[in-house]
Each structure stands twice: as C-alpha cells, then as structure tokens.
Amino acid sequence: MDGGSGQPAADTEMTEAPGGFPAAAPSPQMPGIENIPATLSHGGRFIQYNIFGNIFEVTAKYKPPIMPIGKGAYGIVCSAMNSETNESVAIKKIANAFDNKIDAKRTLREIKLLRHMDHENIVAIRDIIPPPLRNAFNDVYIAYELMDTDLHQIIRSNQALSEEHCQYFLYQILRGLKYIHSANVLHRDLKPSNLLLNANCDLKICDFGLARVTSESDFMTEYVVTRWYRAPELLLNSSDYTAAIDVWSVGCIFMELMDRKPLFPGRDHVHQLRLLMELIGTPSEEELEFLNENAKRYIRQLPPYPRQSITDKFPTVHPLAIDLIEKMLTFDPRRRITVLDALAHPYLNSLHDISDEPECTIPFNFDFENHALSEEQMKELIYREALAFNPEYQQ
C-alpha cells in the first residue's frame, strides 16, 4: 500500500512507545485537493468521485471529503471517512484488477490473508467495497485502517530517529512476524514501504500479495520481492526457502533505519550478492551445503571476500544490536536466528513480553491457490468477500 496512510490505529496495551513524531505530509506527487467532484450513482447507493480524471466509485457511506494520499502501479489510494463508523480509512483502488491473472490472484490472496489475521502489528482490512454490478466489474476497492506514513518515508525524511525508535520499530516488526509465521505464512516482501506507522510509533505490516505457505517448496515465477531486502538463498534461486527469508529482510531494514540508507542497494542480482558478501564474507563450504550444485559452483568462482566487522562499519550502533543483526544476516538460513529467538535476544529485553506476543491459532489455508481459477471465478470470490462486509448489497 505504498504511500497510503493517516489516522491512528486502536490504542494498544503494548509497551509504551518512545516519543512520537509528526505525521508526514502527503506525498508530493499527490497534493491535497479541496472540493473533489462527487456524484451519486446507482440510485444513491454509491458515490462517484473524479480524482485526476479517474473515477473512484465507493458506497455512499464514504461521504465527502475524500483525499488522494498515494499512487502506485496498481492505482490510487484515498483517505475517506466511513460515516457509519466515523472511522477514517485508506481506500485502495486496484484498477483493471482482472486483466492479469497473477495480479488478480495477488489481490484475492491479500484479502483472504488479512481477513484471516487479527494482530496489532498487521494492517487490518475494514471493508471490501462491493461493486454496483455483480457480473460486470473490473476494479476492486479495499479499505484498510488508515496510518500516517510508512518507514520508507520516515527514513528518507529529516525526521530524527533515536535508537529507542529504531529498537521499538524492530520489536514491532518481529512481533507481527511471529504471528504471521505462526499462521504458516511467509510474507516474502518485507521492505520499509510495507511497514506503516502512525504518530504514536505504532507499526503495522502491510502488502501480503506475495505471501506464501511456509511448507511450499516450488519456486514461484511471479516472485518479485524487492532485490535489496532479498535473502541470499533467493538470490541463488533456492526453491527450498523457509521463514528465514523474512528474518534476513528484517535485518536489512533495521540497519537501514540506523544508517538512513539501504544496507545492500544492489543494481542487479550479481551486484546484490557481491554487496552482501563484501560485508558478511564468502560463505564456507559448510555454509554452502543447503544450495544446489549450480549455486555452489557460482559462489566458488567468485573472488573471496573476508568478513567485515559490522561494529567497525557502524560504530554508533549498540553492541547488542550488532550481535542481533549478525545473527539475522547469516548466509546459511539453517543457522539464521528465528523470529522467536530474535524477540528473546538481550537487545530487546526492555520490550519483550512473551505473554503479549500472540500467535495465530488457526493456520492459514492456501487451498484456493491450488485451483486454476477463471477470471469469473476470481470475481465471484472477491464479490463474496465484499458481501461478508456488506451483506445488504447482496444481488
């Protein structure tokens, strides 16, 4: 949900956050707009807004004003008030959602996953807006709880971040990830823009369109996680990846928070691998055991890199934080620290409370992924999800 964010999430019982920060201004590409044209449609049950020449059609409970707050490849995000609940939400319009089957499945996956999950550190879906016509719709509108900004915007800003801020963000990412992994799910696309924040420093993980079941071993051709946060086993095309891929991403994100620039900003796959080996060193034969022969051969023909001292490279970072990061940025995923052990690491002693780090009691069922769904079937499944929120719109 790039760039989509403003209004606090529900108050939590979590450990008190460090001092908050002012909400980020709207994205420069999406200036605030007064008096966006609005027209009632379909007998007054819907409202059409005209935003930058795009039709944005939602149920009539989302009364004016409506504010564009973000834009991505998928479409546009607006903040709006639900007049029935008085809650502000971020509504993402996915335009032409069924033109591409892979994208349509991503949308369905995200909806089903977020409806299954219930956790303070995972963004919640508040509504799937039903289409006016059951059998003739191409756009999907999803309303999420509204947050103020995301970690990418904060890192790029000149907003001061204390070590306590960074530590608290790290804790919340791991707390959310514990729940995700306990649901038998890998996120697979953790990066700063997928971590939403509000002014209280509450953090919520979003964008589950690439999530996968943890026991799945076939490599997905659609897998396009941002290169900079990608674990070495994925860069080397290992099909047998585990929850450890998310832990690697968290290590990269934390160091980016501390240093205000990406840890491994690779230009391509080859450069990405070189950057990470320049820091953590060329893996030993023992550390290569989990890889296939092609990947082993590739690593062996690279020039050897000695391991650098992360402490020397980042002298201002707390020694306990360095110790945890070294355990996260371990080449061999079998030896990489788990989320549970990371939460229990001494660096997070002041925040860790196992009684307030819930797990998901029912694993997520990805069975719908196993069927070759037609466009009409995917439309029907998304329509049913919309009816779960809006039974009165049954047609």
UniProtKB/Swiss-Prot annotation:
Residues 1-35 are annotated as: Disordered. One of its GO terms (molecular function) is phosphatase binding. CDD domains: STKc_TEY_MAPK (cd07858). ATP binds at I69, G70, K71, G72, A73, Y74, G75, I76, V77, K92. It is found in: Cytoplasm; Nucleus; Cytoplasm, Cell cortex. Induction: By Alternaria brassicae pathogen infection. The TXY motif contains the threonine and tyrosine residues whose phosphorylation activates the MAP kinases. PANTHER family: MITOGEN-ACTIVATED PROTEIN KINASE (PTHR24055). This is Mitogen-activated protein kinase 6. It comes from Arabidopsis thaliana. The gene is MPK6.
